[in-house]
């Protein structure tokens, strides 16, 4: 959540939020996808997408500039051939995009962060490692009611701003 908020606030510098939590449970009905959607405040719900297509037709680069949270729902549907593209997308901080009916490319900041869900535990099969994904087991039904978005995002923003103050303070000996 901290990385997501930093991404939205444009506080990522040369590196984007390149880590995605993946909610996993072998049992269906734990509300993993519902929880992912509930992370977005109602006013920003149109910036949530749970149908990421890793193809030219899906325009994933454009989605990074236009959406706030991309849910890789049923993460195991992405094959090993798509992982290099996904890893590349996850580390992009700026995007060169040519919007519809335009001839010139524009450099746009990346806004979107990633999250995912799966009903399988054997989904990370990359022999070179999977440092971009953190699997979190949903052991019980996730309570998605009464998410206090104002409080959550105010706290995340305060933590980010506080970290900036600590970074910019001169070292005292």
What are the residue ranges of the model-derived segments?
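AAA+/SF3 P-loop NTPase mechanochemical coupling elements
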Residues: 59-65, 99-117
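Conserved catalytic/switch belt of AAA+ P-loop NTPases
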Residues: 83-106
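Short, polar loop motifs at secondary-structure junctions
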Residues: 119-123
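C-terminal, non-catalytic macromolecule-binding modules
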Residues: 138-164
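Residue-level detector of conserved catalytic or cofactor/ligand-binding positions
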Residues: 165-173
């Amino acid at each position: 959540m901290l990385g997501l908020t930093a991404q939205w606030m444009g506080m990522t510098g040369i590196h984007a939020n390149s880590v995605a939590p993946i909610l996993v449970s072998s049992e269906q009905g734990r509300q993993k996808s519902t929880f992912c959607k509930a992370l977005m405040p109602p006013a920003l719900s149109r910036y949530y997408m749970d149908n990421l297509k890793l193809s030219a037709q899906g325009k994933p680069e454009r989605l990074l500039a236009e959406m706030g949270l991309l849910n890789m729902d049923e993460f195991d549907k992405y094959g090993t051939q798509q992982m290099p593209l996904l890893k590349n997308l996850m580390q992009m901080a700026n995007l060169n995009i040519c919007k519809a009916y335009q001839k010139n490319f524009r450099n746009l900041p990346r806004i979107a962060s990633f999250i995912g869900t799966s009903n399988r535990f054997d989904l990370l099969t990359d022999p070179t490692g999977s440092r971009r994904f953190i699997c979190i087991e949903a052991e019980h039904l996730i309570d998605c009611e009464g998410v206090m978005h104002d409080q959550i995002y105010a706290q995340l923003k305060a933590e980010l701003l506080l970290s900036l103050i600590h970074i910019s303070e001169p070292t005292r000996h």
